[in-house]
């Protein structure tokens, strides 16, 4: 059961990552004139909606509503990581150091996904 849930979560995260980045292209976010927190929040909301759907699936199976607290922590962590790395990514693109921007973008996605998987697995094992 744990393996099935973890697999579904991983697939949801990967699908979300692809779909979320297609709906709000990172290039548009990175080329924004000002460091707008609303753009970051909008990106995270679209990125997080399928994860929220996964939480409702989890609630339907286990009748445990505290999974929503896990989702909120992941949401907050994602906003913080996006905000902290956003300025670095924008300056890298402005200076035409695209390799740095790509490293930071994938690094931030790796951090968020790792945080989600570790905290989810820890939550299930309790």
Regions found by a protein language model. Give the residues of each.
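N-terminal signal-anchor/start-transfer transmembrane helix
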Residues: 8-26
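Interhelical loop and helix-boundary elements at the membrane-water interface
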Residues: 22-47, 79-120
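Alpha-helical transmembrane segments of integral membrane proteins
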Residues: 4, 8-12, 38-42, 65-73, ...
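Helix-coil boundary and interhelical linker segments in multi-pass alpha-helical membrane proteins
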Residues: 1-9, 52-70, 117-126
């Amino acid at each position: 059961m744990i393996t099935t849930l973890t697999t579904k979560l991983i697939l949801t995260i990967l699908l979300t990552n692809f779909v979320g980045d297609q709906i709000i292209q990172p290039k548009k976010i990175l080329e924004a004139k000002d460091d707008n927190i609303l753009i970051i929040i909008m990106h995270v909301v679209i990125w997080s909606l399928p994860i929220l759907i996964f939480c409702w699936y989890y609630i339907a199976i286990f009748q445990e509503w505290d999974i929503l607290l896990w989702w909120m922590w992941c949401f907050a962590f994602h906003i913080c990581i996006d905000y902290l790395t956003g300025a670095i990514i924008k300056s890298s693109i402005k200076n035409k150091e695209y390799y740095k921007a790509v490293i930071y973008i994938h690094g931030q996605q790796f951090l968020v996904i790792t945080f989600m998987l570790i905290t989810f697995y820890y939550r299930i094992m309790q």
